[in-house]
Amino acid sequence: MFTNLTTVAYVHAESRESTILNDVLNGFTGVLVSDFYTAYDSVPCAQQKCLIHLMRDINEDLYKSPFDEDLKEIARRFGALLREIVETVDSHGLKARGLGKHKKAATGFIEHVGAMKCQAEAGLALQKRIAKNRDKLFTFLDYDGVPWNNNNAEHAVRAFTRLRNTIGTSTPKGHREYATLLSIQQTLRYRGMSFLEFMRSGRMEIDSGSGR
């Protein structure tokens, strides 16, 4: 499933292999916003990892390892940095001009974490994770309109889950047909348009004659 702020595309595949990602995203020159699934690393484009996923994982680690001081230090610094960034987004939107002021702090956070002498397992694992993804955590600071999370994708996944629970099992052909219909329905929803009216109109393209 692939989405941006106005369009959703569900692609039926037997697995989440990286070859499928590269086929779908061949020639893509934008910024890919994703979770930390390793197959995305093979896509040759700028990338932004979902910071909500990272924060959730950090909170889960804190719950499991409440006495890991290194982990708490990383969590504190990351939380403070993210709060400042979100405040800017809330006030000025996803604009590189406004977000650029946080680049120094973001670089400082990554460098500080990299220099830490982590001892316990949880803190050390998080340190390595941040080091591995250091070039993909704050990419959005350099671009207009690139979100720092993949909430749109999460919403689109829930829409597919509801459909799957309703229809139950199906053939691969059926899954492809459902994926096409759901892509149309969700794209129309993102654009504030009626699925029923669009289907009745006989139009073959969503933008055709819509003025949107």
Model features per residue range: what roles?
Residues M1-R212:
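Catalytic center-proximal scaffold of phosphoryl-transfer enzymes
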